[in-house]
Design a protein with these regions (language model features):
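Intrinsically disordered, low-complexity repeat and linker tracts
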Residues: 1, 5-20, 38-57, 624
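Intrinsically disordered, low-complexity, compositionally biased regions/tails
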Residues: 8-12, 16, 27, 62, ...
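Residue-level recognition of conserved structural "scaffold" positions that shape functional pockets
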Residues: 15-19, 30, 577
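Sec-dependent signal peptide recognition
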Residues: 21-27
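C-terminal motif of bacterial Sec signal peptides marking the signal peptidase cleavage site
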Residues: 32-35
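N-terminal maturation segment of proteins
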Residues: 38, 48-624
Length: 624
């Protein structure tokens, strides 16, 4: 299954991840104070040299060669796109409403396989693709093709970091693992035709086979000394127990019946027969699949002896570095640079909060009881649509559905998540909201800004309706997508939303600092080797009772290495570009134009975006 089919917030947002036939994708679309005066900081330069293409051929020769090269690249794009989506029925269904229109008529498996062998084949295919990409003469391609080529080259360079480290892959995790997210995808498997129902039932019936593959992979990890700790295993097992459904009345049965109701011309007898088959598939395959995982993982207890973060494994530091770059697509050159930048961002934002509280002591009492103008999800979405018109380009009208996470799954899933629409039908957008009281401290207004307008839904629909490359539409770079959502979430505190403007500024700075603290701990635990005592000591600088949260924070970082970084580092990259543009353009800076540039770029690693940002900035200076 493609990574990041579900886009969500930082508490548990990202990955359903397995090998691909062609191995193209690291990620595919899928989801968190002291007393001194603020110091003005010039942002670190975040521009890269613009791309330059050299070609000395004559005009007639260039035109002929260009046509051939462009056609060759177009064929490669089509081939990659079709290969990726034909590898698994589940991915294909979520990404294309009408696959036949893209030349795809069959798939290799209900769900893409999970195994070390499949991952090794992925790496080999990626090396072959990397070699093929290097054969293109960039100067002869169209501008859009050049961008796609550069994105693919960057992606393949990052993926090469994981060569030989296949057994470090983590398909299971408490809230962002396959076992936690797959049921929600099944609940949203749209029935356009009767055949879709048959395909869905085949996937459910395949689930025990698929989870058997995952268990075999975990057993291979254990034999290699790479198994997760018993603490992490307990978290995953607890997640699995949420899906031991009660027969006859559960969310999987209810959602199936609701989707059947959307099918026209289905007789009552056919409906009853399909419902009976679904209940049988759940009882005979879905629940046994989770029991298989639970029993198998229980037997693996004691095989995982690493109680530290990722760096506690033999090559864990190298694998974590790969995770950092694949999750962020960052333009920073080293993890040490990321640590420094994260520390600086935390400090800058805490200085802002300190200055605000010092200059406006009344804000302290406001923090204890504040309210947004809108509190209902649909009203918040509509207000945000209006609020964003000033600084963001207008999105064509699109439909969306807001749903609550099933009560039985609240403890196993993120605070909220967005299910992306098919690339050929942007009308299907679903946002799930987790109503569990443990998330009451996360204001719904900002959560919906992250997931809806101007966050994931807005950015995804914009890209689907403005990008001509089908291949690019199925590539997802978490640093860009989650970075964008975290960036606009922070902005949402300062909209005209019913809050006192100074309070909004305070909450925005505090949210950025808090996310930064999580990101720093992610790096410190998984790269520097911090233990729980180190985490508690670090937290004591920011929280009055660090002992009460140090344990859970440490375990979260161990369970989900690099998860927080896509949110924080991605949003930091965007803020750095904005600060650079504001500094160099002065009064000529236009937020809507800056956001339009980023939206038009779409999903891409920041090392590529930076070079295009340099060109955009030069054009802005010249008034173009």
């Amino acid at each position: 299954m493609h990574k990041d089919r579900i886009s969500g917030r930082a508490e548990g947002a990202s990955a359903i991840c397995t090998a691909k036939k062609r191995g193209l994708l690291a990620a595919l679309c899928a989801m968190l104070l002291c007393s001194c005066s603020p110091v003005s900081r010039t942002p670190e330069p975040t521009t890269a040299a613009p791309y330059e293409d050299e070609n000395t051929a004559g005009y007639e020769q260039l035109t002929e060669e260009s046509a051939r090269e462009q056609q060759r690249f177009s064929k490669l794009e089509t081939s990659l796109f079709q290969d990726e989506l034909s590898s698994a029925r589940l991915d294909l269904h979520f990404l294309l409403k009408n696959p036949e229109s893209r030349g795809i008529t069959q798939t290799d498996a209900p769900i893409a396989p999970v195994s070390a062998e499949a991952l090794r084949q992925t790496r080999k295919d990626q090396e072959d693709l990397r070699s093929e990409l290097s054969s293109f003469q960039t100067a002869l391609l169209t501008e859009d093709q050049k961008l796609t080529l550069r994105i693919l080259e960057s992606l393949m360079k990052t993926e090469a970091k994981s060569n030989g480290l296949e057994l470090y892959s983590q398909p299971l995790a408490p809230t962002i693992g396959t076992q936690a997210q797959l049921p929600m995808l099944l609940c949203e498997y749209t029935f356009y035709t009767r055949q879709d129902v048959e395909d869905y039932l085949n996937i459910v019936e395949y689930l025990d086979t698929f989870y058997g593959q995952i268990l075999s992979f975990e057993q291979e990890k254990a034999a290699a000394g790479l198994m997760m700790s018993d603490t992490s295993l307990d978290h995953v097992i607890e997640s699995c127990k949420s899906y031991l459904l009660v027969p006859g009345n559960n969310f999987m049965i209810d959602s199936f019946k609701e989707r059947l109701n959307t099918l026209p011309d289905l007789t009552d007898d056919a409906r009853k027969e399909l419902c009976a088959r679904n209940e049988a598939a759940l009882e005979e395959h879905f629940v046994p699949a989770y029991k298989l995982l639970i029993d198998g993982l229980e037997k693996l207890k004691g095989t995982g002896t690493n109680e530290k973060g990722m760096c506690g494994y033999p090559d864990g530091k190298a694998y974590y570095e790969y995770l950092v770059y694949t999750e962020t697509g960052t333009s920073y050159h080293s993890i040490d640079e990321l640590l420094d930048a994260t520390e600086q961002e935390i400090s800058d934002n805490l200085k802002i909060t300190s200055k605000l509280l010092s200059d406006h002591p009344e804000l302290e009492s406001m923090l204890e009881d504040y309210h947004y103008r809108q509190t209902e999800p649909s009203a918040i979405m509509e207000e945000l649509k209006e609020q964003t018109l000033q600084d963001f380009p207008q999105l064509p009208e699109c439909s969306y559905t807001l749903k609550d996470v099933p009560k039985a799954l609240e403890l196993s899933l993120s605070p909220a998540f967005y299910l992306t629409s098919p690339i050929d039908d942007s009308s299907q957008n679903v946002i799930y909201i987790n109503r569990n009281p443990i998330y009451d401290n996360q204001p719904l207004y900002n959560t919906i800004a992250h997931e809806g307008y101007p966050g994931h839904l807005y950015q995804t629909v914009w890209f689907h309706t403005h990008c001509d490359s089908d291949l690019r539409k199925i590539l997802n770079f978490s640093g860009y997508s989650e970075g964008w959502a975290a960036y606009v979430e922070a902005l949402s505190y300062e909209l005209d939303n019913g809050l006192d403007p100074l309070l909004g500024e305070l909450l925005s700075a505090n949210s950025k600092a808090t996310l930064g603290i999580h990101a720093y701990l992610d790096l410190a635990v998984n790269y520097l080797g911090w233990e729980q005592d180190d985490v508690q000591k670090y937290l004591s600088s920011y929280f009055s009772d660090p002992q009460s949260i140090a344990g859970s924070m440490f375990e979260t970082m161990v369970d989900n290495p690099a998860n927080y970084l896509s949110y924080f580092i991605g949003s930091l990259e965007i803020r750095n570009m904005r600060k650079t543009a504001e500094m160099q353009l002065g009064d000529a800076f236009n937020a809507k134009q800056f956001h339009t540039f980023l939206l038009d770029m779409g999903n891409a690693p920041f090392d590529v975006i930076q070079a295009y940002f340099t060109t955009w900035l030069m054009n802005q200076k010249m008034g173009n």
